[in-house]
Amino acid sequence: MINQLINWQELSPQQKNSALARPAIADSALLSTQVANILSQVKNQGDKAILALTEQFDGIALSTLSVSSAQVAQAKLALTDKRLKAIHTAYKQIKSFHSAQTASDITVETTPGVKCTLKTEAIESVGLYIPAGSAPLPSTVLMLGVPAQLTGCQRTVLVCPPDKNGQLADEILVAADLCGITEIYTVGGAQAIAALAYGTETIPAVNKVFGPGNRYVTEAKTQLSQQVAGFAIDMPAGPSEVLVIADGQANPAFIAADLLSQAEHGVDSQVILLSDSESLISKVSTEIAQQLTLLSRCKIAEQALKQSRLILTKDLAQAVEVSNEYGPEHLIIQTEDAPTLLSKLRNAGSIFVGAYTPESAGDYASGTNHVLPTYGYSKVISSLSLADFSRRFTVQEITKAGLQSLAECIIELTDAEGLDAHQRAVTIRLEEGS
């Protein structure tokens, strides 16, 4: 269970840092070496290594890596109407919100004869990594696939570990089809990321890879982003987390449910409650104990709760300060004066306002993206959006008159920096025909 209540007012600066400390991410030299070995095998042996590693780690001997269009068609027939409707509804919701993010080119004439343009273009090829654990994750397919589709990436490749029969879940294939993804491969783990970075006989390399994964996948993404020229990753990955700010009028059952919904993700997940009401905190603690027994993943949630926090603050203003310092992945506000708090909150991956806005809605169907910065990265990294699937570059066009108007400035600054060739690139143009 969660450790006893923490009174923020009574903590020293060092104790406050400890109270907000996140679970340590294992940094193993052995892991690094193991992943480096996998990457080397894929780089040098291509498909042969992929098939061998899949048999080694997934226990399945595959004859092919590609998923056929016939398999996708069969998946549509295999799912119930109810399951299909849910996937389509989530797709529609996510597409609706993300469609509004489409960027337009910006052109400014900074001075007469000097035109500057900011252009946005889709990344040409992207890879989407979809984990496969105890259940399929079609929501992750949609959260990654919809932005890629709307941005207009020329190639979108999906990789996912095969099940014990060498297949991908029907939900994965249906969600991928909705997003217009036709390149689908049954490969997972570090070897999948290596295939996307280096390319193999079957899987062409991509420019950028997206998606969560275990520590082998995370390590592979990190190593490859540093080794392969032009290969990028989405964002640093860490354990899932949620922070709730609540006042005395909040519903303790709702709060407990929200905290447990994150705790069940993994034993390294962290959940935090900040409140100015000791009575509410006590009620939430009781609710957690009661609801925990109802969960199929209660053992996992129970482990996560050991590194979680129930914090009593002087007032809600102090709760906001603590939240901004922590910078949670998910931030839930359940207070009567939520708009006032919202205006002061700066660091969060995604914010959920009001009693009827569970974090689960954002995970699946509200329309926002559930790929969010964790481990405090919300202070510097944004939630996933169309911007992550595109890149921007500038274009400038200058007339002779425009260059003449800038010449004095450029000549003086190049003189200050001692860059004669830069200066001459300007003067030679103005001397011509003068």
Curated annotation (Swiss-Prot):
Protein name (Swiss-Prot/TrEMBL): Histidinol dehydrogenase
Q: Does the keyword Metal-binding apply?
A: yes
From the UniProt record, report the name of the gene that encodes this protein: hisD
Q: A single GO CC term, please?
A: cytosol
Q: Which CDD domains match?
A: Histidinol_dh (cd06572)
Q: Which cofactor does it need?
A: Zn(2+)
Its pathway is: Amino-acid biosynthesis; L-histidine biosynthesis; L-histidine from 5-phospho-alpha-D-ribose 1-diphosphate: step 9/9
Query: What is written in the cofactor note of this entry?
Result: Binds 1 zinc ion per subunit.
Q: Note the PROSITE patterns from the entry.
A: HISOL_DEHYDROGENASE
What task does this protein carry out? Catalyzes the sequential NAD-dependent oxidations of L-histidinol to L-histidinaldehyde and then to L-histidine.
A single BP term in Gene Ontology = L-histidine biosynthetic process
The alphabetical list of record keywords is: Amino-acid biosynthesis, Histidine biosynthesis, Metal-binding, NAD, Oxidoreductase, Zinc
- Which InterPro entries does the record cross-reference, listed alphabetically? Ald_DH/histidinol_DH (IPR016161), Histidinol_DH_CS (IPR001692), Histidinol_DH_monofunct (IPR022695), Hstdl_DH (IPR012131)
